[in-house]
Regions:
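Short acidic/histidine-rich motifs immediately flanking catalytic phosphotransfer sites
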Residues: 73-75, 135
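Internal, well-ordered domain-core segments that constitute the primary functional module
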Residues: 125-198, 202
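Residues at the starts of beta-strands that form the adenosine-phosphate
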Residues: 2, 29-30, 60, 137, ...
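Conserved N-terminal Rossmann-fold NAD(P) cofactor-binding segment
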Residues: 38-73, 80-89
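Long, compositionally biased stretches enriched for glycine and/or charged residues
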Residues: 179-263
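NAD(P)+-binding Rossmann beta1-loop-alpha1 motif at the extreme N-terminus of oxidoreductases
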Residues: 1-49
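Rossmann-fold NAD(P)-binding glycine/threonine-rich loop
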Residues: 83, 87-155
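Short helix-capping segments at alpha-helix termini
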Residues: 23-26, 51-57, 156, 178-180
């Protein structure tokens, strides 16, 4: 079975690590990397191949500089692309800040600018997948995930799901705080990508969220992702907020801090 990684960026080694760890449950023969930056593609292929071998992965890692060849016959496609790369990201973040507006890749005008660059590229890849890998499942990690997924569903017939590691990170944090295995803790997350809340934490059928919220200061001391929020705010909403909601709950403060950091 073939899997293609669209975008050979910093996420590639993490994806390969997960694939290697789950290899016993996968019938994966090869992972093919594709990127529009030839130098980065060669570098990440060499790095990924070295890591995969050191992890004992049963699949090969190679690259294809041509998107059609990279995607042809793939059973799964993992997408993590950034059209314009870091130079465009810097513009997305800096221009809004000059006008007192948050600049961020999924929020406000910066997020919209990224969407304008990303949607045409992702729709084009989706249409290519339709043609050369019609049975593939596209797993999209490309931001802004929500609007990119809407575009894929509206303008292609490719099977696609959007993912984010945020909710999993939140669930893992709560499980560790409660001193329980992650598999024993079911966290109900409601909302959109980078805009959601955990509204229930089930352990053996019992909702432990009220306890977690009552002890929120203790939770904050165990994981920095909660440090942004005032405990009284969390108690007033009765849910655990995704860290990106900081940019909504504390917009003016966020803009001030980003400006002050010089980044």
């Amino acid at each position: 079975m073939k899997m293609t990684l669209l975008g050979a960026g910093v996420r590639a080694p993490f994806v390969l690590r997960g694939l290697a760890a789950g290899a016993a449950d996968l019938d994966l023969d090869e992972v093919v990397l594709f990127d529009t930056d030839p130098e980065r593609l060669e570098l990440m292929t060499a790095l990924g191949g070295h890591f995969a071998a050191s992890w004992g992965a049963p699949f090969t890692v190679r690259n294809e500089p041509d998107a059609e060849s990279a995607l042809a016959g793939a059973r799964f496609v993992f997408s993590a692309i950034r059209p314009g790369q870091e130079a465009a990201r810097a513009v997305d973040e800096e221009v809004p800040l000059k006008h007192g507006v948050l600049g961020q890749e999924t929020t406000g005008p910066g997020g919209f600018a990224m969407a304008l660059r990303t949607i045409p590229a992702m729709v084009a890849y989706g249409q290519l997948i339709e043609r050369v890998a019609p049975n593939a499942l596209l797993v999209n990690f490309t931001n802004p995930v929500g609007i990119v997924m809407q575009a894929l569903h509206d303008h292609t017939s490719v099977r696609a799901i959007g993912i984010c590691d945020g909710p999993i990170s939140m669930q893992r944090s709560v499980a560790e705080f409660l001193g329980l295995p992650r598999e024993q803790v079911h966290a109900d997350y409601a909302g959109l990508n980078h805009c959601g809340w955990i509204h229930r934490v089930l352990v053996d059928g019992e909702d432990r969220l009220p306890e977690v919220i009552d002890r929120f200061e203790e939770l904050q001391a165990t994981d920095d992702q909660w440090a942004l929020f005032d405990p009284e705010l969390v108690r007033s909403i009765g849910m655990l907020p995704m860290e990106y909601l900081y940019f909504y709950y504390y917009r003016d403060t966020a803009v001030e801090h980003i400006r002050g950091s010089g980044s």
